[in-house]
Amino acid sequence: MNDYIIETHNLTKKYGSQTSVSHLNIHVKKGRIYGLLGRNGAGKTTTMRMLLGLTAPTSGEVTIFGKPFQGNEKNILPHIGCLIESPGFYPNLTGTENLKIFAELRGLRSPKYIKNALELVNLVYSTCSQHFL
């Protein structure tokens, strides 16, 4: 059995011609505490965002709990907690899709919770958004 809870293999993120993270290989052992240190712009936040599926890597792989992260997000994410700099959301998803994820993580599976949350901030819950529920 693999002793590593998080692994990356040549993890890379490019924004156009700018490389933010280059061929990163991390091996985090179960039960250990690690930190990412570096100057501003060193790629710490980008690395964390890739580990959580918030930002897609340009290339490379992420393995969490011995499973490839890509394709297993729904099984892996409920077992992970992370706060990067400030509370956030998944920028590649709609507001309704973000609310659905956060509701499910809290065990709130009924679409009424999302509808109520949108109504609280005076946003309309449309039949279009029901497609994602």
Question: Where would I find each of the regions flagged by the language model?
Answer:
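Short coil-to-beta microelement around the adenine-binding A-loop and adjacent beta1/P-loop entry
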Residues: 18-19, 74
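Helix-to-loop junction immediately C-terminal to a conserved catalytic motif
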Residues: 52
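Conserved ABC transporter NBD signature motif
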Residues: 60-71, 75-76
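Conserved ABC ATPase "signature" region
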Residues: 100, 104, 111-128
